């Protein structure tokens, strides 16, 4: 079946996985949803195993845990390869269980891993299928004949890419949990009209969530990438002005993914385009930082990451030109970055780092009343904490 054909074969089950990325909320209903077609016409036993693990709400595994993907995590992520989940008993790749018992046999190994976004069974060798699965993010022909391909992604390729791009630690495990918070089967109009329970994005965004799925030419076209980034920033600004902070942050983050296609601009990039590209990226990072502090709940780690990127870029590059306008913008952007990172540290109750950043902000914007107020508030908190400690110590020796 063609990877570009989004119409499922009649009779094949359509299931979904709704994900949560750490504490980050979905920007709209269904925006973190992966919709999958199961190849019941080719591998009915394997497809039924996955379908039931998506829909079961009562049956228990032999461990006494729910026989379901719900509340399990993606425990293994390897960029440019695959994302793996389905271990709902141990969450580390050593557990899981099928609806037929602990393991079941390979049904058909002739399916090809020839395109991205295929759904395939993870195993520990021949005939060791359980509940663990993986979704490919590139063609993986070396897996042919070893793993059962039993489905494909119909919708939510950007969600798969987002999982693929998360920060990982030892054993390729995501640093923050990527959890399947809900799962089930879709039928009726949601399938026939291909909405799949996903609320429509009404921002006018027609771009793929990740640039690698948009156009191969972008990697060699700085101008086209810049204009997509600019368009996405404008969409985000509109949502920000409407206080739709979750959607705005989604668009700012997406714009940065596109701009990151060119972390170092080619030497032949026109000077005005190079300057505009850098300015746009800094502006989006600063906006994303502010936006992350306004979402519910706030996302201080996202704010810190974006502010740190701005600070690193501005302080590692050559000094601003002698033009007063350039110098003013340089110090203004640095002040914003330090102030917003300080605000994120305050949200994390890390006043020591917040104080250091606020002092840096004041160095770059000596007359900024907001920075001064926050420093005063921080000093009051510090004094109150010291008084509390003194009172506690005095009681110990009274």
Curated annotation (Swiss-Prot):
UniProt keyword annotations, A-Z: Cytoplasm, Isomerase, Repeat, Rotamase, TPR repeat
Single biological process term from Gene Ontology: protein folding
The protein's enzyme class: isomerase
Coiled coil: none
SMART domains, A to Z: TPR
Domain PPIase cyclophilin-type stretches: 21-185
Catalyses which reaction(s): [protein]-peptidylproline (omega=180) = [protein]-peptidylproline (omega=0)
Family: Belongs to the cyclophilin-type PPIase family. PPIase D subfamily.
TPR repeats: 229-262, 282-323, 335-368
UniProt gene name: CPR6
Subcellular location(s) per record: Cytoplasm
A GO term for molecular function: peptidyl-prolyl cis-trans isomerase activity
Pfam families linked to this entry: Pro_isomerase
Job description of the protein: PPIases accelerate the folding of proteins. It catalyzes the cis-trans isomerization of proline imidic peptide bonds in oligopeptides.
Any one GO CC term of the record: intracellular membrane-bounded organelle
Protein name listed in UniProt: Peptidyl-prolyl cis-trans isomerase D
Main location: cytoplasm
Domain of life according to the entry: Eukaryota
EC annotation from Swiss-Prot or TrEMBL: 5.2.1.8
């Amino acid at each position: 079946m063609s990877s570009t054909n989004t119409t499922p074969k009649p009779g094949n089950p359509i299931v979904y996985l709704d994900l949560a990325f750490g504490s980050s909320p979905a920007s709209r209903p269904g925006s973190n949803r992966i919709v999958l077609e199961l190849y019941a016409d080719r591998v009915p036993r394997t497809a039924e195993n996955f379908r039931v693990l998506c829909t079961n709400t009562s049956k228990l595994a032999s461990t006494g845990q729910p026989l379901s993907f719900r509340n399990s995590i993606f425990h293994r992520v390897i960029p440019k390869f695959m994302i793996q989940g389905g271990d709902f008993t141990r969450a580390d790749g050593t557990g899981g269980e099928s609806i037929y018992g602990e393991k079941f046999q390979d049904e058909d190994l002739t399916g090809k891993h020839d395109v991205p976004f295929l759904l395939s069974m993870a195993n520990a060798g021949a005939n060791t299928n359980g509940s663990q699965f993986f979704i490919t993010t590139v063609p993986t022909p070396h897996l042919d004949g070893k793993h059962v391909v039993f489905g494909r992604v119909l919708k939510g390729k950007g969600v798969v890419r987002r999982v693929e791009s998360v920060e990982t630690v030892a054993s390729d495990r995501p640093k923050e949990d990527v959890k399947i918070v809900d799962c089930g089967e879709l039928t009726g109009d949601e399938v026939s009209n291909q909405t799949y329970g996903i609320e429509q994005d009404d921002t006018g965004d027609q771009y793929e969530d990740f640039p690698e799925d948009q156009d191969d030419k972008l990697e060699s076209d700085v101008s086209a990438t810049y204009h997509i980034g600019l368009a996405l920033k404008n969409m985000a600004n509109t949502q920000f002005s409407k206080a739709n902070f979750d959607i705005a942050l989604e668009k700012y983050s997406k714009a940065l993914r596109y701009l990151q296609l060119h972390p170092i601009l080619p030497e032949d990039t026109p000077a005005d385009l190079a300057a505009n590209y850098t300015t746009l990226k800094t502006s989006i990072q600063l906006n994303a930082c502010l936006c992350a502090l306004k979402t519910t709940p706030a996302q201080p780690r996202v704010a810190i990451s974006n502010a740190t990127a701005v600070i690193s870029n501005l302080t590692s590059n050559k000094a601003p030109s002698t033009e007063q306008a350039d110098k003013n913008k340089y110090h203004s952007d640095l002040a914003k970055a330090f102030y917003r990172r300080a605000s994120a540290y305050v949200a994390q109750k890390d006043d020591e780092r917040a104080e250091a950043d606020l002092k840096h902000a004041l160095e770059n914007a000596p007359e900024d009343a907001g920075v001064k107020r926050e420093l005063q508030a921080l000093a009051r908190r510090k004094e109150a904490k010291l008084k509390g400690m003194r009172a506690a110590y005095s009681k110990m020796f009274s």
